[in-house]
Amino acid sequence: MGPTSGSQLLVLLLLLASSLLALGSPMYSIITPNVLRLESEETFILEAHDAQGDVPVTVTVQDFLKKQVLTSEKTVLTGATGHLNRVFIKIPASKEFNADKGHKYVTVVANFGATVVEKAVLVSFQSGYLFIQTDKTIYTPGSTVFYRIFTVDNNLLPVGKTVVIVIETPDGVPIKRDILSSHNQYGILPLSWNIPELVNMGQWKIRAFYEHAPKQTFSAEFEVKEYVLPSFEVLVEPTEKFYYIHGPKGLEVSITARFLYGKNVDGTAFVIFGVQDEDKKISLALSLTRVLIEDGSGEAVLSRKVLMDGVRPSSPEALVGKSLYVSVTVILHSGSDMVEAERSGIPIVTSPYQIHFTKTPKFFKPAMPFDLMVFVTNPDGSPARRVPVVTQGSDAQALTQDDGVAKLSVNTPNNRQPLTITVSTKKEGIPDARQATRTMQAQPYSTMHNSNNYLHLSVSRVELKPGDNLNVNFHLRTDAGQEAKIRYYTYLVMNKGKLLKAGRQVREPGQDLVVLSLPITPEFIPSFRLVAYYTLIGANGQREVVADSVWVDVKDSCVGTLVVKGDPRDNRQPAPGHQTTLRIEGNQGARVGLVAVDKGVFVLNKKNKLTQSKIWDVVEKADIGCTPGSGKNYAGVFMDAGLTFKTNQGLQTDQREDPECAKPAARRRRSVQLMERRMDKAGQYTDKGLRKCCEDGMRDIPMPYSCQRRARLITQGESCLKAFMDCCNYITKLREQHRRDHVLGLARSDVDEDIIPEEDIISRSHFPESWLWTIEELKEPEKNGISTKVMNIFLKDSITTWEILAVSLSDKKGICVADPYEITVMQDFFIDLRLPYSVVRNEQVEIRAVLFNYREQEKLKVRVELLHNPAFCSMATAKKRYYQTIEIPPKSSVAVPYVIVPLKIGLQEVEVKAAVFNHFISDGVKKILKVVPEGMRVNKTVAVRTLDPEHLNQGGVQREDVNAADLSDQVPDTDSETRILLQGTPVAQMAEDAVDGERLKHLIVTPSGCGEQNMIGMTPTVIAVHYLDQTEQWEKFGLEKRQEALELIKKGYTQQLAFKQPISAYAAFNNRPPSTWLTAMWSRSFSLAANLIAIDSQVLCGAVKWLILEKQKPDGVFQEDGPVIHQEMIGGFRNTKEADVSLTAFVLIALQEARDICEGQVNSLPGSINKAGEYLEASYLNLQRPYTVAIAGYALALMNKLEEPYLTKFLNTAKDRNRWEEPGQQLYNVEATSYALLALLLLKDFDSVPPVVRWLNDERYYGGGYGSTQATFMVFQALAQYRADVPDHKDLNMDVSLHLPSRSSPTVFRLLWESGSLLRSEETKQNEGFSLTAKGKGQGTLSVVTVYHAKVKGKTTCKKFDLRVTIKPAPETAKKPQDAKSSMILDICTRYLGDVDATMSILDISMMTGFIPDTNDLELLSSGVDRYISKYEMDKAFSNKNTLIIYLEKISHSEEDCLSFKVHQFFNVGLIQPGSVKVYSYYNLEESCTRFYHPEKDDGMLSKLCHNEMCRCAEENCFMHQSQDQVSLNERLDKACEPGVDYVYKTKLTTIELSDDFDEYIMTIEQVIKSGSDEVQAGQERRFISHVKCRNALKLQKGKQYLMWGLSSDLWGEKPNTSYIIGKDTWVEHWPEAEERQDQKNQKQCEDLGAFTETMVVFGCPN
């Protein structure tokens, strides 16, 4: 063997040794969740594979830039634990994690002895959850919202933290903001909010978030609406959840109607079916049926024929993909209540099932079983139970379980091609063509180094619950001869984003299948992921990791226990006001939040209830695992399960970049509902567009327009016009042949009106919609793990079903929502008093009391009474009680109507009592009726002012004076409310976009060459790292690239030291003279790099000392004796002009930047800086070059010396205020402007900064290239400083004081940026002027709105519009809602009086009281090719009457345009106030016309309801006209001197002003007989006001004289504009004049009036 052979042997031996070493080298790994949550305890798993002996491990978590250690833990990996251990880490929330700036990372460093494993991990601010429970789901204006906020951590255990709570309007405007702590609150914050009376209707929101995590918000919604609780509920259920288009049967629906107290309803249901296509509803007119509801149930059927006849084209294929809906309105036989219900989204399908692969992994292992989790749903998305499913080409078959999921195992081929799998249902009775089928494609798992090493996990498909054991099968497949190396599997359990468990499953030699028995504990709810892996040295000698994962569902339930129930021994029927028992069973120490809610609340709004499933939904959404299991390779398995994995041998997962999983594309769901039936005529048009034109021509419209007139509106072309005319003429002839009447009526039996005296009965009067809002603690020791609390509660007065809702929070078991417990409260005889939400003062209204008799056999004879209340006119008066006697058959009810006229504004009591003859049975009900003022509620904007005290006013204090509102048209005897609204205007400081970090990759290079070349290479790397650090863009650039860049900087630093001369200065080569500029540049670069790598301060400060001692002249100037060879690296300094100033400024900047490091080591540093600064000051004003002005300006700014006059010079040198420019020198200009930007940032001149940054960005200069060293360094230093310094918003800190004359002290508000958009309000009932002062920084808005009721005037002027409005009864054949009392047709005709048509015009229509428009008519007018209106809107937000807005494309100037639609009356009101119609042009609001409308009165309508005393009572608020026959002198004196009489006048009526609501009488005071509160003098005028309904009773005549007196409570308004109300206590008596005294019957009265006057004036009233 020659020498060569010997050397070959040596090489072989070395290779063998190295491979043996590789086999034995341990693999250290760290596994963490790939999203770490701040302030939460996280588990990190540490492993050493193939290690010998104990391995000490230190785990440190640092901020991403590794400037700060956040937390650290130590442990030891021992052989006893298989070198597997865990540490618990809690990362504190600190200001470094500013949530506003993109994603945040931490660096996790694990030191396994001397081996370091390091990984950047994403951080999340979610440190827990907030769950919000409201006491109800719907509220009325003026009521109180009670709500609780449960503060829990990520394990759902109570936590004490600071919470921010915001209440938002439906428009998203925050109006209330509280910051509260849940410390010492046991995790429950009980709160309330009073809803104002004046409030926007709609969906309000309570938003809450932890103070340290403002982006992680949680919310609950509640509805604000004017409503009255219904007395029963209606449920509509189809027999099947889908409609099978090829089935012979129709769609059957069952209707269930039950009173809230559990008894069945008898009534009538009106049912209509329809088809919904996207957002278009097609009602099937022929499907409208009337269904009798007997004993609570009824049925309706949509036949296949009606469905197919009602749509065009009439083919099954055209309907597939659409859905059916059914709308049901149930009316009680008594007519006292009606409830609507709708069931929509019933899909029309060819197959009754749908197959989904959402729970199936997307990757398979070749030649190993693939577990398909097939999710089968009904077409409505609900799970399809017990449906057989099969895979094509395989014998695999399974049955879906209750959750709709079936597990199918498929054997896969031994190749790495994508696997296509088709799954079908196999339900008996359905043809193969109609079975559901779905295909998916699975991708092969990619092994490392193309090996055949695989792991497959499989679990059985059972519904798991705590206490069960899950068998997990580990299936192994390896390359030949490799399986012996696998001695164990490491497995991990992920739940709720946390590593819950880690362990080892041992594998014995020869075992292909290993089974792990995993106990399921409550912590595993609601689901978990099991991840397992093994590692080995593969056949190629390379380390390999093989992994798999599986997602496992666990039955959703509480971790703990909470049950609410009654006393099992108490079998009595709960009755109103009686005591009952509640038993609460739960975990000891838990606190239970209770509430009892009337079930009627959930009939109106069942959304937004807090349930346990909603809690788990929120938790599941926060899961950081993203797939149903497996992954594309080992790293994908970890990544998709929510884990990060890193080893010392380069094996690792990819970087996670978003805390949330990528959302799959949202699947559009088809909605469901109504439209008109197509007739055969339309079927003649096969073109879809022409068919639409034909159908619109056949629509019935309310206006009497001819086909020709209608066709003028068509813009779709000639063919559409012809189709429209053809079908319009066709249907017109058809209608003439077929005229049909269709009248639906409801009969009502007469009632007996005998009057019988009545004993007192205690009325039920407390009807809360929710109560029992308490928190109870379970203190009793546990028995069988349960603590019980027994509560005795008194039920409220409602006859209903109460739902008792309970939510508990326990230190050990977390949050739990109990199933609702129902308490049905009733008695077998009772009154249900049905009241509207509100009525208008002085308007007659009908209310109904329904009496129920639930006795099985007995007919009851009942005396029922409406009690007198002076706040109402009714048949019951102060003198006579109003009884009726009625008979109620067993198990039925009788409605008793009452007509009342409310006289007083506010909340008034209505009380009805009933007693049964010959029985000790009675009931009484006292309810509150809201009475609102007449007239129209007006929101008058009094003032809108901008608050900007810093800029709008001298001295920084802004004063605003606001006058009182002009309320001259206010309805008498009503209040006004002024709302003063303040809102900050948060102005964002729009930061310019950062330069994209990805564009900087060319700057990070390996430095090399001489001392100058090394600096040219290294400087861009230093500045690029600095810039990426400051702008937090490493995520884009590549997190792992930062460490590589730092290594290059270290290399450059080491290399540069080779060029350090003994005197500590630097040159290109050691034999060259040292360079002042190069040494200063070295100092600048490594002062910056000192934050990145370890720099020897002595080396750095040695260079600083050399510059000062060797290169600074006595006058402060620095000199250059060794110019650099590479002149291109020195930037703008290369221009020799003003070189001394440029170099001195450059070195001065270097000294300032090194000052923090070197001030302690170089004593002469401050003096040197000052000398250089003085030189720059002396030279500055004479500088010519913009470059020198900029660099010297920055040097002076560093010394706080860039002040006047230098500042003006500095700013004026800028061209266009955005750049310091020399012609044709782009690099110099970028460098100079960067220096200037740094100076502006030091000056905090943030108004001048944006245009400069914009210019630098617009230059698109990304550094690099010949001669770019200085420009690159400076632009990125300046832009990095800009990102660090510029505030993200302009300051807002303003104090606002309101000075209201009626208040003794000012009201003070503080507007701050944090809560700037919060709308603050102050309300006052006084209509008064006030002043406001504002001081501080920022902007805000003051808005002052006065809300009051304005009188409606009948006369209006018209400008440029002619308008006619009429109203007439609708014909008997007209279709109207079943609960409408009457229907009328409103005709509106208008013409524009200009030369051309008025475009974009608006009709603003206020409805008459009790009337609402027919929306079907409005839909008709707004749809179709012949559209008469563009759109319409209903507005009820601030009104007790409906307002309808109609938008018109144009109003003709040559002919009248008319609209007609029905309006329906839903309550019988007596005095119907007029409605109004206003037309105006959108483009010129001054061009408008208003007209009023009112049905013709038949004797004023009030007389129709006069019976016995009713008329007098209906006019009880009018005075009783005095005649001389009735009253003696003494009676006059007695009446005039009664307590409360304020004034006695002789008056003369001079003027009468009549309006639709009130009459005003202007009286001249002829004589003050008795003076009162108003200091009026004879001869002065005063205004007397009376309601219009008293006009006929008063019969006052102009020019006549009257004796008048009244109460002080009837005086209204402020002096000197006092008005007098003529009310029921006002005395008005005609005073005959001289010529009238000739009549003998007037003489006695005149004598008495003279004597009365003399007595009152001389003697006055007796005390």
UniProtKB/Swiss-Prot annotation:
Glycans are attached at N939, N1617. Gene3D superfamilies: 1.50.10.20, 2.20.130.20, 2.40.50.120, 2.60.120.1540, 2.60.40.1930, 2.60.40.1940, 6.20.50.160, Alpha-macroglobulin, receptor-binding domain. The modification Phosphoserine is found at S40, S297, S303, S671, S968, S1321, S1573. SMART domains: A2M (SM01360), A2M_N_2 (SM01359), A2M_recep (SM01361), ANATO (SM00104), C345C (SM00643), Thiol-ester_cl (SM01419). Complement activation is inhibited by VSIG4. There is a cross-link at C1010-Q1013 (Isoglutamyl cysteine thioester (Cys-Gln)). InterPro entries: A-macroglobulin_rcpt-bd (IPR009048), A-macroglobulin_rcpt-bd_sf (IPR036595), A2M/Complement_sys (IPR050473), A2M_N_BRD (IPR011625), Alpha-macroglob_thiol-ester_cl (IPR047565), Alpha-macroglobulin_TED (IPR011626), Anaphylatoxin/fibulin (IPR000020), Anaphylatoxin_comp_syst (IPR018081). One of its GO terms (biological process) is complement receptor mediated signaling pathway. C3 precursor is first processed by the removal of 4 Arg residues, forming two chains, beta and alpha, linked by a disulfide bond. During activation of the complement systems, the alpha chain is cleaved into C3a and C3b by the C3 convertase: C3b stays linked to the beta chain, while C3a is released in the plasma. The alpha chain is cleaved by the serine protease complement C2b component of the C3 convertase to generate C3a and C3b following activation by the classical, lectin and GZMK complement systems. Phosphorylated by FAM20C in the extracellular medium. The keyword Phosphoprotein applies. Residues 1634-1659 are annotated as: Interaction with CFP/properdin. The record marks A747, R748, S749, R959, E960, R1303, S1304, R1320, S1321 as: Cleavage. The keyword Oxidoreductase does not apply. One of its GO terms (cellular component) is protein-containing complex. The record marks N1663 as: Coordinates Mg(2+) for interaction with Complement factor B Bb fragment (CFB). Keywords: Chemotaxis, Cleavage on pair of basic residues, Complement alternate pathway, Complement pathway, Disulfide bond, Fatty acid metabolism, Glycoprotein, Immunity, Inflammatory response, Innate immunity, Lipid metabolism, Phosphoprotein, Secreted, Signal, Thioester bond. GO terms for molecular function: C5L2 anaphylatoxin chemotactic receptor binding; endopeptidase inhibitor activity; lipid binding; receptor ligand activity. It is found in: Secreted. Residues 693-728 form the Anaphylatoxin-like domain. Precursor of non-enzymatic components of the classical, alternative, lectin and GZMK complement pathways, which consist in a cascade of proteins that leads to phagocytosis and breakdown of pathogens and signaling that strengthens the adaptive immune system. In absence of complement activation, the C3 precursor is first processed by the removal of 4 Arg residues, forming two chains, beta and alpha, linked by a disulfide bond. This is Complement C3.
